[in-house]
Amino acid sequence: MLKWKVLAIAGMAFGLAGLGWGYAQQQTFPGFYELRIYKAQPGKRDALAARFASRTAAIYARYGITNVGYFIPQQSDPELGIDASDTFIYIRAYPSKDERDKRLKLAQSDPEFREVVISQERDPNARLIIKAHNIDMTPSGSYTAIAVVP
């Protein structure tokens, strides 16, 4: 009888350990997202995308800003003000809005960011961006699927 009790307790312990491990392996997603839509100077969209790929995304990552994705629209939508030839879109993620504010402030004070982005955007002959739109977002309570497609 004692043998069965020991086995039952051991089984429950392993079951609980497995359950805990399963919860620990669940992928969690940040609680705050930011959709950024840039209208680039004519003919400068690809240069803007290259600046993000080569420098800006790495600066953000250094400060704990999650680069969710960078996108080039494949068609224009005049109703939304999107011209596929000059629009660049990206999504960043953070644990919260307060963390977004803190992390962006740190990133924007980084000497490399100031050199790469701020100085270029202040120079009328070198700037890449005409206008930037920002949409703050949180996951819907019922369903949010964020997946990376190979």
Which residues fall in each region the model found?
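Sec/Tat signal peptide C-region and signal peptidase I cleavage site
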Residues: 19-24
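The conserved glycine-aromatic submotif of the RRM
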Residues: 77-89
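Surface-exposed interaction/gating patches
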Residues: 28-51, 55, 59, 91, ...
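Intrinsic, low-complexity N-terminal interaction/targeting segments
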Residues: 67-75, 80
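Bacterial N-terminal signal peptides
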Residues: 9-17
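An amphipathic, aromatic/His-enriched active-site/gating alpha helix that lines ligand/cofactor pockets
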Residues: 25-28, 51-68, 83-85, 93-135
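Bacterial N-terminal signal peptides that target proteins for export
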Residues: 1-9
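Active-site-proximal beta-strand/loop segments in catalytic clefts of secreted hydrolases
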Residues: 38, 70-73, 93-94, 135-140
